[in-house]
Structure formats: structure tokens, C-alpha cells
């Protein structure tokens, strides 16, 4: 269970055949796993940027980025994350895209679809990667919850089942719930609701 329990795999991956590997970032350990000379990394968040930086010295790296991310110091983000409202892309704390370009990384837009051996980006350009790493994030491990537990709109730590609360999953608690620093808000809300129950 948790906010990052299941690797998120794009549906187009099922149509793709490459001579090398197709890995989710959760399966990646070191550059030697990617035996081919080139690699497409899908996802421009922190994991994708870190992988691009690590693989750039030994591979021809293409980084597919769906949403441009702001680059900022982690400390500034941590101060502001709790004040943020609404869904926004997480900022990138590692190298900027410009630094990656300087390291030889090719930055491309998001992947639209895949054919047998090729990938088409949303701008219509096509590449034929030898290997692919999916830095596409995770889905929460809330599949153990019955459908009746999900409420819309979500309320901090609440479910649709009286007496059942959820902590640590942003879909139930809000931005930052999946961090040590942020889960306290879920715990506080749960404690308050338990105390206030008749």
C-alpha cells in the first residue's frame, strides 16, 4: 500500500518492441542494465532527470518530457509545498533541462504513441529507441479499499466508510501526504475526527 505502490506503465508500451530493455525506473539499478548505446527516458520529473544525468556519459540519451517542470532548490519547494493548492507538476531538484542538453541529452516532447519499433512524440517526430526507461511515476496502493470508500471531492484522510481513515496517500490527504513531513496533517485530521466523533 502507499502512494507509490504500483509503477505507472503507459498503455503504448504494449505495442513497442526494442532490441534492448524496457524498464520502469523502479527496476533500474545501474547503467550496465542498458546494454544498447541509446536510450529513451520517458518522464521529465526528478527520476527521469536523474537517470538522464547518470546515463549521459555512456549512452545517447533522449528525454521525453510531458510537462515542463520548474527547477528550484529543494528547500524552497519544501517551504512552499504545504501552501500550494490544486494539482501542479512537482518541481525538479536536479539538473535543469539546459544542463542536461549541455551534457548531450536530447530533450523531446511527450510520447503520443508507439509502433512496433518506433515512438512518436506529440509534435509528430519519430524515434527508434534501442532501450526505454519509464520514469512515469506510480499509482497509489489503494486497491484494497472498497469503491464505497472513495469520496468526491476528497476530504483530508476521510473515506466514504464511517470510521475508516487513510493517511499517507495524496489522493486522500492532499499534496505532501506521502512525505514524512506532510503525513502529520493526515494524522492530525484523523485524530481530530476521532476525538470529535459522538
Task: Show the residue positions of the predicted features.
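Flavin (primarily FAD) cofactor-binding/catalytic cores of flavoenzymes
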Residues: 1-198
Amino acid at each position: 500500500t502507499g502512494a507509490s505502490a504500483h509503477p505507472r506503465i503507459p498503455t503504448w508500451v504494449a505495442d513497442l518492441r526494442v532490441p534492448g530493455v524496457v524498464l520502469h525506473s523502479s527496476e533500474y539499478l545501474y547503467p550496465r542494465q542498458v546494454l544498447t548505446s541509446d536510450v529513451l527516458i520517458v518522464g521529465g520529473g526528478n527520476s527521469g532527470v536523474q537517470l538522464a544525468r547518470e546515463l549521459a556519459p555512456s549512452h545517447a540519451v533522449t528525454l521525453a518530457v510531458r510537462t515542463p517542470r520548474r527547477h528550484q532548490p529543494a528547500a524552497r519547494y519544501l517551504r512552499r509545498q504545504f501552501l500550494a493548492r490544486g494539482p501542479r507538476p512537482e518541481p525538479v531538484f536536479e539538473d535543469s533541462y539546459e544542463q542536461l542538453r549541455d551534457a548531450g541529452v536530447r530533450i523531446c516532447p511527450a510520447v503520443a504513441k508507439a509502433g512496433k519499433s518506433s515512438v512518436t512524440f506529440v509534435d509528430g517526430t519519430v524515434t527508434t529507441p534501442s532501450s526505454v526507461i519509464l520514469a512515469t511515476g506510480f499509482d497509489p496502493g489503494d486497491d484494497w479499499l472498497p469503491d464505497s470508500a472513495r469520496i468526491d471531492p476528497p476530504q483530508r484522510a476521510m473515506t466514504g466508510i464511517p470510521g475508516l481513515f487513510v493517511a499517507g496517500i495524496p489522493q486522500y490527504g492532499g499534496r505532501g501526504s506521502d512525505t514524512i513531513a506532510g503525513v502529520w496533517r493526515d494524522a492530525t485530521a484523523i485524530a481530530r475526527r476521532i476525538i470529535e466523533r459522538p
